[in-house]
Regions:
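Ser/Thr-rich, Pro/Gly/Ala-heavy low-complexity intrinsically disordered linkers and tails
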Residues: 21-81
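Extracellular beta-sheet/turn segments enriched in Thr/Pro/Gly and aliphatic residues
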Residues: 65-80, 170-204
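Short, ordered, surface-exposed loop/turn motifs in non-cytosolic proteins
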Residues: 84-86, 92-124, 152-153
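A short, solvent-exposed beta-strand micro-motif common in secreted/extracellular proteins
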Residues: 104-106, 133-134, 143, 153-172
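Short, acidic Ser/Thr/Gly-rich low-complexity loop/linker segments typical of extracellular
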Residues: 108-148
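Helical hinge/lid and interdomain linker segments adjacent to catalytic or ligand-binding clefts
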Residues: 213-332
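A glycine-centered loop/beta-turn motif at secondary-structure junctions
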Residues: 310-318, 400-508
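An acidic, glycine-rich "communication" segment
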Residues: 317, 321-428
Length: 522
């Protein structure tokens, strides 16, 4: 059965008085087999029937008989004195925070399934946005988008997507002029809570290594991902029917703990069949989140992590996971991650904990003085969209001072401590491979990204009943049932922004993100 046909049949057979219709199928098998030019002798199509995308819907032709438009392209020039425009806002799965850098587009055919994990297409942004987009837009720091030259008519599909996060909706009617989806639709446009929320929805395959000192695994629950997506079962490549897209691994000391961190308990992060022990294991995942373990990560495999990022993987590492990037035993950078920061570690004397909470300044320019559009977007988002700043600064509940990033390093600082002694960089990132080839515009064609955070993101949330020092109880928790659900703490707001930015196509530092190009008639 054509997926789009089953969806459109669902529109016909359901009593859809609502202005937003999620992708689902209903109705009889007889009607689902009907289509333009089917020759089944069934007579006229039922009222409201719309041919599935790509079936019997090619339209105008040029004078020489060649095709001038296909499917919804034929409905893009139906307005006199101007076309149709779509506007609206896009939110996280919880529907709480508007999101930056999310692409919105009208597809001209069914979007293709998104494969899990790292493969030959992982470095290609163009491979993500399938369905032949014919009208596109992208959200700004306020989560707002504008799509111009949209097709007019009934049952117009819209895809919202950032990286491998994707959701799919249908607008029952688009008219000439401006169509404000915030008022026309009864529900918000959100990224999906589950893998199968709509017909073409998708959640990245995410691996999380838990830790003794933080609860990074709970962030995804707070931004709206369903508990049903959490599993202690490693993902397959491709997915192969494994349940859930949030895969929990036991970091130190859960590896030796009798208390499971998931039900069923997840495997060890570093042991055989774990998360980073081999390339084939880690390559199953689109994104890897490493939650602080309370001590230096045991048995890190920097070469495997570097291979993963070079091929398009995305990594968020916090605090003691610096062991992947710096060899504390020799006081030298790991050779796979040279000069990403100047490290000054707790083990080198004096400890690394600030006595109290600190403030951080969001970096809106690069160390060179050049523009940093994504840093400016982060500042604007924290300041006016989610109101997370105190004055102009971001409050950090539990910060550490293990690293400083300056213009002499290959990384980009996103948040620097302000007024704290010693100084530190709280968030920074770098793109890989370090020796990336140049693209046609002369810019490095980076593939993957690492974000390092020198703080505990769950410190203000009281996950697993922790009321003070997370070190005292995080390891006793069960994920995701022990996670606190509620409004994000300000420093966790910043992590949400960075997490979804990490999911997206790698935008070269210093440039502004752009929507994908529109498709031309075939």
């Amino acid at each position: 059965m054509n997926k789009q046909k089953s969806f459109v049949t669902g529109l016909v057979c359901s009593a859809w008085g609502a202005a937003l219709v999620l992708a689902s199928a209903c109705g009889s098998s007889g009607s689902s087999n009907r289509g333009a030019g089917s020759g089944d002798g069934g007579g006229a199509e039922p009222d409201g029937y719309v041919p599935p995308l790509g079936v019997g819907s090619s339209g105008g032709t040029k004078g020489d008989g060649s095709t001038a438009c296909v499917n919804l392209q034929c409905q893009q020039s139906a307005c006199s004195g101007g076309g149709a425009t779509l506007t609206g806002h896009i939110y996280d799965p919880a529907g709480n925070n508007p999101l930056y850098k999310v692409v919105a587009y009208v597809p001209n055919e069914d979007p293709e399934p998104i494969a899990d994990g790292i493969d030959s297409t992982s470095c290609s942004c163009s491979s993500l946005y399938t369905g032949a987009p014919i009208a596109t837009g992208i959200t700004g720091p306020d989560g707002a988008f504008t799509i111009t030259n949209a097709p007019v008519g009934a049952n117009i599909p819209i895809v919202i997507q950032i990286g491998k996060w994707r959701n799919y909706f249908v607008i029952p009617k688009v008219a000439c002029g401006t169509n404000d989806l915030d008022t026309l639709l009864p529900a918000k446009l959100t990224l999906p809570k589950t893998q199968n929320e709509t017909q073409f929805s998708n959640i990245p395959n995410i691996a999380i290594s838990t830790g003794n000192a933080d609860s990074l695994e709970c962030l995804l629950r707070r931004v709206g991902v369903s508990a049903s997506e959490y599993t202690g079962t490693p993902g397959a490549l491709p997915d192969g029917g494994q349940p859930g897209h949030i895969h929990i691994f036991a970091g130190t000391p859960q590896q030796a703990s009798t208390t499971p961190n998931t039900k069923p308990p997840g495997p060890s992060s570093s042991g055989p069949g774990g998360l980073w022990d081999t390339d084939s294991d880690i390559d199953r995942y689109d994104i890897v989140l490493l939650s602080c373990e309370g001590s230096e990560t045991g048995n890190p495999q920097p070469a495997n992590l570097a291979d993963y990022v070079n091929k398009g993987g995305r990594v968020f590492a916090s605090h003691y996971h610096y062991a992947f990037f710096y060899d504390d035993s020799t006081n030298t950078d790991q050779p796979e991650f040279p000069n990403v920061a100047d490290w000054s570690l707790a083990s080198q004397g004096g400890g690394d904990a600030y006595k109290n909470g600190i403030n951080a300044a969001i970096q809106t320019t690069l160390a060179s003085g050049a523009a940093f559009p994504e840093g400016q977007a982060l500042y604007t988002w924290l300041d006016t969209t989610v109101n997370a700043l105190t004055g102009s600064l971001l409050p950090i509940t539990v910060g550490r001072h293990d690293a400083v990033v300056s213009g002499t390093n290959v990384s980009t600082a996103w948040a620097q401590s302000s007024g704290a002694t010693p100084a530190s960089t709280q968030y920074f990132s770098w793109d890989m491979p370090f020796n990336a080839p140049l693209d046609d515009a002369g810019a490095p064609a980076y593939c993957g990204r690492v974000v390092y955070s020198d703080l505990h993101v769950g410190a203000g949330e009281q996950d697993y009943g922790c009321t003070s020092d997370p070190n005292s109880c995080v390891y006793q928790g069960t994920t995701p049932t022990g996670c606190t659900i509620g409004k994000l703490h300000p420093d966790e707001d910043a992590i949400e922004f960075i997490l979804f930015d990490l999911s997206s196509c790698v935008t070269p530092i210093g440039s502004s993100p752009q929507p994908p190009p529109v498709a031309t008639p075939k």
